[in-house]
Curated annotation (Swiss-Prot):
It comes from Staphylococcus epidermidis (strain ATCC 35984 / DSM 28319 / BCRC 17069 / CCUG 31568 / BM 3577 / RP62A). The gene is pdxK. Mg(2+) binds at residue 142. ATP binds at residues 139, 176-180, 188, 213, 238. GO terms for biological process: thiamine biosynthetic process. This is Putative pyridoxine kinase.
Length: 276
């Protein structure tokens, strides 16, 4: 049987823990055929590990999209988009491609960085991506920006933000709480317009978790492409990334990536799902 084809529109992380590299590793683990339209290249200073983001020329970006659309993706995922023009184009491409699913990972900062890459991108995401997305996967910071509610510090805050984001047009909202809400458990909140669900796993090591957000969104996309419902895909992706985080490893003195192969090679983590 032919593999489902999945396109990631994302940046390249030269350290290969996040970005399109994380997406392709995840796609391979979950039996979908991954394609890439590159938006930018992220490099790191070898002394400080500060990030430098170099955008891809728009003409080259368009040629990548033409190639990918001609192949015919079943699902599309976005990661670091970088500019408002690329954000708008990503939304248009989903419609043009005829893909069944559109997963938006609303990347706003690089791991370890504090400043939003481009403040104007938030409004562009709200206008061009959220109304078309099947699933949106913000972390607490990104959910606070997309909802306009600012800092989120509790499950109740997450519920309010999820409702606001849902009202902007995305039928499935999953907010990643991660380590911010509790030291012993990892809590995410999923909302489908009808019911809120809390997804819980044990809290694993957090020193080596580079690429966790990209991996979660990529896994969600792969599971959707292979036939799971949005709720099933999100729960399965939570289990996949939990295994990857638990088995993260030290790359150098600055960073350590998650282990994208841990779910298939080492262990599968149980996810507790409760209505809240």
């Amino acid at each position: 049987m032919a593999l489902k084809k999945v396109l990631t529109i994302a940046g390249s992380d030269t350290s290969a823990g996040a970005g399109m590299q994380a997406d392709l590793k995840t796609f391979q683990e979950l039996d979908v055929y991954g394609m890439v339209a590159l938006t930018s290249i992220v490099t790191m200073d070898k002394e400080t590990w500060s990030h430098d983001v170099t955008p891809i020329d728009m003409n080259i970006f368009e040629k990548q999209l033409e190639t990918a659309i001609s192949i015919g993706p079943n699902a599309i995922k976005t990661g670091m988009l970088g500019t408002q023009d690329i954000i708008k184009r990503a939304g248009d491409v989903f419609v043009e491609s005829g893909a069944d699913y559109f997963v938006v990972d609303p990347v706003m900062v690089c791991k370890g960085e504090d400043e939003v890459l481009n403040p104007g991108n938030t409004e562009a995401m709200i206008q061009y991506l959220l109304p078309k997305a099947t699933v949106v996967t913000p972390n607490l910071f990104e959910a606070g920006q997309l909802s306009g509610l600012g800092k989120l510090t509790s499950i109740e805050d997450m519920k309010k933000a999820a409702q606001v984001i849902y009202d902007k047009g995305t039928p499935h909202v999953i907010i990643k709480g991660g380590k911010a809400l509790d030291q012993d458990k990892s809590y995410d909140l999923y909302y489908d317009g009808q019911q809120f669900y809390q997804l819980t796993t044990d809290m694993f090591q957090q020193s080596y978790n580079h690429g966790a957000g990209c991996t979660f969104a990529a896994a969600t996309t792969a599971y959707l492409a292979n036939g799971k419902s949005p709720k099933e895909a999100i729960i399965a992706a939570k289990a996949f990334v939990a295994s990857a985080i638990k088995n993260g490893w030290k790359m150098n003195d600055f960073v350590g990536p998650v282990d994208h192969g841990a779910y298939n090679r080492i262990e599968q983590i149980n996810v507790e799902v409760t209505e809240v």
